[in-house]
Amino acid sequence: RARGGADGTDGDASLAPGGAGIRLPRRNEALAAAGLAMRNLGDIDRQSVAGAISTGTHGTGARLGGLATQVRGVRVVGADGEVREASPAHEPGLFEVSRLGLGVTGILSAVTLEVVPAFLLRAQEEPWPLDRVLERLGTPDDPDGLVGGNDHFEFYWFPHTRRALTKRNNRLAPDEEAVELERLRTTGPGPVARARTWVAEELLSTGAGELVQRRATAVPRGPPRRRA
């Protein structure tokens, strides 16, 4: 239980203690049941809580930190078997090293996370010309730029082309959430939308991408040369 318990929250609704060995999907399910969520996550959620924070897993968003920044307390089992509790107020040195330490201080058996009320994200994925992306990146303080104007922004450049795939994720305002939740309850995604999602995420992003990478590994070649 200490290693893998899917605890909810303690008396403070913003703090969620739990076993460090629990996988992120189970932790997120437990939080969602309480109307809560982690502030930021990485692209994948197959890791344990301890593994994700100890190795510096991060998501996107110029105003958001990695998973380690959400940690507010740890329980560490040292090589000698000693169990120590650490937080910003108690043994802060051990706390800082342990929350992003690759296990050098010992095994994390419990982690307390700072969480937020559950929220919805609106996702927009569009192909853009690379020049347009670079021109509009901006800085974290620029609300009109792609970086500062979105909660989460990332782009993937296709080598040897001038095209990029942009991804923007933004939290919905409470009134927008209510409208979106009602729409999902009454209609849900239609068959066309489900088919489009499957083609984009499974067939193209995963299946076709894997085939291209395997082909490139088996038959490598140099980058294309531009004609003078």
Each predicted region: which residue ranges?
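Noncatalytic alpha-helical scaffold of FAD-dependent oxidoreductases
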Residues: R1-A228
